[in-house]
């Protein structure tokens, strides 16, 4: 965790709430302007990472274009939240470590600071982020395996890889809260001078805090706070249920360390802010997403009639397939 202090994550990918909101608004506005100018927002990508932007439309009086409505910034936020939850689902399905899940989520979040969901569909970017996270964390899973495991075309995963890496500015090392949680729990053993029964309780706290960190990672918190503070917030939330340690006293012990950058009240306020984001987080349901998905398809130039014909073709193929096959199938980690 010491390396976080000199990392690109700290220097480039931690924002104030105001700056983060500005980045999202700017990405949305670029796509809105593209839709007005070109009648579509789809940015094509090839395997080398080269981008092809839509051309200006000829004639501005097209009635069909006037019906196109861009996604609002709030609708984009819902879309990102929906697919961030899907990142966790995919990682859980493959039993990937928490670190891969966290890295994939950070890649996804950072990508959409540069782009609108109206320009690159998050379903495709999500899978590429999972694949890229596996590579950087040295968990050797091929794009074919990921695609096959969730019934998606692996060529799309590979097609977007270079575009994703470029959008991340090749800042691929991600610091997540999980290792810091382990470090704090080890430090708590010393702080409590823990006996066997207390060590067992601390193990429960570690497990609970890890689950809470998964929730924290779905909020904007990873773009607003360093991983040490995310870890402490996760521990405090879990401890509120388990009651393993006097957490206020433990925070006082942390800020009394020579390298502490915060007072107890400052640190408590930071943890309160993280907990607020977790409490107010809402994952959109499939039902919530229906209207937004329809708008997104229009922006990307995917007509509903085309989608319906594809669905009919798929149903027809599925029906003929079924008829021919009768059987279905030490010291506390830094916090600043």
UniProtKB/Swiss-Prot annotation:
Check the record and name the PANTHER family matching this protein: CYCLIN
Q: What is this protein called?
A: Cyclin-H1-1
Which SUPFAM superfamilies does this one have?
Cyclin-like (SSF47954)
What are the subcellular locations of this protein? Answer: Cytoplasm; Nucleus
GO biological-process terms attached to the record: cell division; reactive oxygen species metabolic process; regulation of DNA-templated transcription; regulation of response to water deprivation; regulation of stomatal movement; regulation of transcription by RNA polymerase II; response to blue light; response to water deprivation
Assembly behavior:
Interacts with CDKA-1, CDKD-2 and CDKD-3, but not CDKD-1 and CDKF-1.
Superkingdom of origin? Eukaryota
Q: Which family does it belong to?
A: Belongs to the cyclin family.
UniProt KW keywords: Acetylation, Cell cycle, Cell division, Cyclin, Cytoplasm, Nucleus
